[in-house]
């Protein structure tokens, strides 16, 4: 990867080393999104020197897929405490032994089976690689997300230079707030804190919830302006000013089949139009 990061926007130059890590996934609508949009939707940030990675696990075996399905069936039911205890126990070994990964161009390939229950393990492996490669910031997101590039980079540049940065879309989860896994920003101090306390990571929770528990009482979520776009009609109702001021967009439609690709393409057009309009 690049040894020196130089980002230029509005005549500004920064030497921050930034990585964007996208939690890869298989099946639909993700295959359609990857085929139609990736990695092209990140090409502008890549041109500015930001490194883009897709984090992949291994294809689950038949038995592993049965366990994945069983876990997810419990997770969203009244029996979720059983799921939490079961996955926490079965994945406990990864608190002391994060699996290795290999890097093939833009892909960080982790030696763990794919699945929501192992997403935290997969991302911890990717975070360790990013930390070892001396990145200043890591932004974790999803295949159905995009960012407003110039606002994104300016936001990072203006952050405090000291202390833990744990940023994202704040999610109020009772007494346990956390940053949404589709929009999470961490600096080196945050990554270091995670690895120093990884033995407390609860793999019974999804990765973003587990991360929130790690930072609980230590660092509050630094809000990153975000919009969750669910339909084409919603895009048409959003003002150009709001689009220009928003950093992160989660484009996850409610329709069946999902039309995330159409939404992302239209949103990219609106972003381009807002950049070209100096009156906004």
Name every feature range the model reports, one short phrase each.
Residues 16-17, 47-50, 135-136, 161-165, ...:
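Loop/turn elements at helix/coil->beta-strand transitions in domains of secreted/extracellular proteins
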Residues 201-280:
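C-terminal catalytic/acceptor-binding lobe
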Residues 1-29:
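N-proximal low-complexity "stem/linker" segments adjacent to membrane-targeting elements
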Residues 116, 120, 137-141, 145-218, ...:
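Conserved catalytic core of nucleotide-sugar-dependent glycosyltransferases
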Residues 36-49:
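Short, acidic, metal-binding catalytic loop of nucleotide-sugar glycosyltransferases
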Residues 26-27, 56-61, 172:
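Short beta-alpha junction loops
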Residues 55-134:
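Active-site-proximal specificity loops/subdomain of glycosyltransferases
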Residues 20-22, 52, 69, 183-185:
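Conserved, well-structured core segments
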